[in-house]
A protein has these predicted regions:
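Short acidic donor-binding/metal-coordinating loop in glycosyltransferase active sites
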Residues: 16
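Metallocofactor- and cofactor-centric catalytic cores in central/energy metabolism, strongly enriched
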Residues: 193, 200-203, 208, 213
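C-terminal non-catalytic accessory extensions
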Residues: 211-245
């Protein structure tokens, strides 16, 4: 009600620790508006059948989501004749909703089903001792916003390049992807590409980071009056100055 009273027709929702999440991306909002969708979400191609991402699928003529914990392994590993994953579309938790659709969901307490999640929960036993179990010992009931797809009158899925929109931090440092290090590398690579597109000569083996107050996308980088011509050392471009590290 508050959003509708303020004249807000669309609501962006991004819910995971992904610094590359394209908040209120103009192109995504444009597709959402042009298609007159109740829900628009962004997808990327999965790196592996066992990626810990939701699977965007079509069931009974509707776009729906199957959480990776609920996806049978034999289905996740299905391959098409050309060798690609059959269920390739990964949800990265980037959504745009019509506020009128969200209002409908809020008015129906049964619109979103419950999911069970097995959790490892510390607790105090009958003797007052604090117990820290190593195996799941509790069941948590959860609701997920992506289940709204099953009742959405119209849903649009937009595929994006992983390198431009997704660098989540989900794994420990020893993992090969979705770590703090791979996230920092992805941010630097994206910002380097923005600078190169704007005509800046940037060494490929340095770290580059751009403060969002300095520029939020490649277009804004190209419009900066203080854009450097060359960058040869690690740099953090801020709203006030360019700081060499």
């Amino acid at each position: 009600d508050k959003y509708q009273q303020a004249g807000i027709e669309h609501f962006f929702f991004g819910q995971i620790d992904n610094p590359l999440s394209p908040t209120c991306c103009p192109e995504l909002i444009g597709f959402h508006s042009l298609t007159d969708s109740a829900v628009t979400l962004q997808a990327i191609a999965k790196q592996d059948a066992q990626d810990k991402t939701g699977n965007i699928v079509q069931m009974d003529g509707r776009i729906q989501m199957i959480e990776y914990t609920e996806m049978p392994p034999q289905l996740a590993k299905q391959i098409t004749p050309d060798g690609q994953l059959n269920f390739w579309a990964a949800n990265i938790a980037v959504h745009i909703f019509k506020t009128s659709f969200l209002k409908q969901l809020a008015q129906d307490p049964t619109a979103l089903p419950f999911h069970t999640a097995h959790k490892t929960v510390a607790h105090i036993d009958q003797l007052g001792n604090q117990i820290h179990p190593t195996e799941p010992n509790a069941i948590k009931f959860e609701r997920f916003i992506f289940d709204s797809l099953s009742v959405s009158p119209k849903t649009t899925v937009i595929e994006a390049d992983r390198n431009f929109v997704f660098a989540a931090v989900k794994n420990h440092a020893a993992a090969s992807f979705n770590t703090v290090d791979t996230c920092q590398q992805a941010i630097s690579a994206l910002h380097r590409n923005w600078l190169i597109a704007a005509g800046v000569q940037v060494d490929m083996d340095i770290t580059v980071e751009i403060d969002p107050y300095w520029a939020r996308n490649a277009q804004q980088v190209g419009e900066r009056p203080d854009l450097p011509q060359t960058i040869k050392t690690d740099i953090f471009l801020t709203s006030s100055r360019s700081t060499a590290r």
